[in-house]
Amino acid sequence: MRVLLQRCYEASVRVEGEIISEIAGGLCLLVGFTHSDTEETVEYMAKKIIGLRVFEDESEKMNISLAERGGAILSVSQFTLYADVSRGKRPSFTKSAPGEKAEGLYNLFNNKLSDAGFIVETGVFGAFMDVKIVNNGPVTIMLDSEEMRK
């Protein structure tokens, strides 16, 4: 499981020209799954994100989590996080989990974040979306469950 976390002032998702979800500030999460991901992987990543201290304290040190600061989450499914560009000119997505599996894990992930008390807005799984993110910092962090559990 990979999550590209971006601290943001605001973020929104449009589908067919209509805004379907938006947040006024917090975290935008681009979320992708691979074949080996499980419910345990989702639980691990949700807990990691919930406690991640990516907001500055009064000393301008990243020492405050979203739970402590307040704010919302915009979670967007992003199978292209598992693109393989090692050969040729066109990305391969064979490392991405099949849609049905990924959708179930994506929904579980969002539910875990919501159950932790966060306002969670989402994109539409599998849809072509226009995602607008106004970064704060910018702070952009890639979380990869396979790398983090080594």
UniProtKB/Swiss-Prot annotation:
It is an enzyme of class 3 (hydrolase). Its EC number is 3.1.1.96. Transmembrane segments: none annotated. One of its GO terms (cellular component) is cytoplasm. It holds the Pfam family Tyr_Deacylase. NCBIfam families: D-aminoacyl-tRNA deacylase (TIGR00256). Homodimer. This is D-aminoacyl-tRNA deacylase. The lineage of its organism: Bacteria, Bacillati, Bacillota, Bacilli, Bacillales. The gene is dtd.
